[in-house]
């Protein structure tokens, strides 16, 4: 079960910290790899099960098996030894899975220098596992519903990446209004960003709600809000190295994610999202640190399976002493 596997993930993190590295064991690494291992491990387990159970042959089957090997090597190894009978121990049903691939050009600007861009290519995926607004009996176990976004930035001088994930631990469906649908529950969050001007990580658990309201015609309005505590997070700091030997500040805190999305006919959509993370510094240059970003994007369908979009991002960094305050902009197609 999910809860029965958590101690093994934490134990694996401890073993690596104490016996697999040359440096002294670090509490922040134990917490980060423990939380991250639980989240990423369960997501990989669920996704690989959906892939190998899919009915396809030829090149499609080869592609499914290759991706399943990438996201969950242990399942492939067990199938080689024990055969497909190990599949009977996987989750008994496969919920709907929506997978998107992204690619384009991303640019970042400094504050007060908006005309100076650093364009570079990026690729990414967006994954939604399960239906948050489906039948009442669909959500029986942790991670029966989760969302994952991963991005990779091809900057030659400073390549970057980001991961934003949240998975349902426990939830209940609600039905506000005449046709509204909602999911409220407890979610686990694993967020990480490392780009040209912005670096942070946060792991936590908290409450959240996701809603969907059909409008007239084919329009639909969606909203989500998550508030969660951060067990341990970190944010980059130019002034921490002289104090701690690290270029980031560490500490517990809190986080918030919000998004408002409106879908229109013909595959068009508009979205506005804002996330903010606050950290109380246990090790670093400032007593309190904050990191947040605002995103506005629009998309339009080109074909049934392809969309073209434009996104504007604003990154802001705050500290109580003002040492690490920063503001940057991003634009991507």
Can you say where each PLM-predicted feature lies in the sequence?
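Small-polar-interrupted transmembrane alpha-helices in polytopic inner-membrane proteins
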Residues: 2-22, 34-38
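Structural helix-adjacent loops and short alpha-helical linkers that scaffold large soluble proteins
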Residues: 2-3, 51, 55
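Structural motif marking the loop-to-transmembrane transition
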Residues: 3-7, 23-32, 59, 63-66
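Transmembrane beta-barrel domains of bacterial outer-membrane proteins
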Residues: 13, 80-333
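Alpha-helical transmembrane segments that form the membrane-embedded catalytic/substrate-binding core
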Residues: 20-49
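Short, amphipathic alpha-helical segments
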Residues: 34-37, 41, 60, 64, ...
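Flexible, glycine-rich linker and terminal segments associated
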Residues: 53-89, 102
